[in-house]
Amino acid sequence: MKDKHIAVLMGGFSSERSISLSSGAACADVLEEQGYRVSRVDVGAHIASVLEQLQPDIAFNALHGPFGEDGRIQGILEYLKIPYTHSGVMASALAMDKGRAKIIAANAGVCVAPSRIMNRFSIGKTHPMEPPYVIKPVCEGSSFGVVIVQENEAVPPHNIGGSEWGYADEVMVEKYIPGRELTCAVLGNEVLDVCEILPDQHFAFYDYDSKYKTGGSLHICPAKLSLNIYQSVQRMSLAAHQAIGCRGVSRSDFRFDEKTGELVWLEINTQPGMTSTSLLPDIAKASGRTYGDIVQWMVEDASCMR
């Protein structure tokens, strides 16, 4: 296996480009240390031609956001018959669409928060649901575009319908669940430990800065929860992973309100970050796996027709 040529796909042209470059560089470094022949590929418009010239044995997908985790790069890799890591075309497309992913997860017995999909221009000056609630782009990651509307706000934020909104017009309006931020990864069909995320006090919630700035958040893994809640998070993570058809690794995010006992699944990430501040490496460490172990497993798991 170590004589394989691996193309690490990174960068791209989504809002998460910088994160992808960090994830990709870290994964490429580890693969080179493990003895693989590695090509670092900053994905652009001509990626199909680039891959045809490189002829890699495996494509390691370290892309994040639209194009990288919504089924499009996966479709190109299927067409070129290049085995690749992470989820396939269908699961990637479904998981990227928060609305459709929630429907599938709920049908699999996963608890979700009440929500509705709307065009941002239709929100206007009337609350689309009783505050507090969250407005977020349907197909973005890393908390880009997330707005929390508090109980004391008389009208929805004006920027949702403004020209400064930098995302697609379709948004999800979802009931805000207060409480603890939890996440859980699935590796193949093995569910790993539950991790609690504690954003630094300077951040209102687990936003982009708290995710990627050094010291922006504290990861407690395994999370200190009752056995019932802990196992519920694991069960729902695996159920969502399987129902959506994910392959390789995924990570599901949750909110847990201790006052009411309400535990809800928020979304699933089919391309979890692999930066120095990312959650997956810490979750893997709690299960006795090193960063290199996870990357090695992904390479060995790579295939087409995922």
UniProtKB/Swiss-Prot annotation:
Pfam families: Dala_Dala_lig_C, Dala_Dala_lig_N
The protein's required cofactors: Mg(2+); Mn(2+)
Any GO CC annotation of this UniProt entry: cytoplasm
Keyword Cytoplasm: yes
Residues holding ATP: 128-183
Documented EC number(s): 6.3.2.4
Keywords: ATP-binding, Cell shape, Cell wall biogenesis/degradation, Cytoplasm, Ligase, Magnesium, Manganese, Metal-binding, Nucleotide-binding, Peptidoglycan synthesis
SUPFAM superfamilies (alphabetical): Glutathione synthetase ATP-binding domain-like (SSF56059), PreATP-grasp domain (SSF52440)
Domain ATP-grasp: 102-300
Catalytic activity: 2 D-alanine + ATP = D-alanyl-D-alanine + ADP + phosphate + H(+)
GO molecular function, one term: ATP binding
PANTHER family named among the record's database cross-references: D-ALANINE--D-ALANINE LIGASE, D-ALANINE--D-ALANINE LIGASE B
Protein name per its UniProtKB record: D-alanine--D-alanine ligase
Gene assigned in the entry: ddl
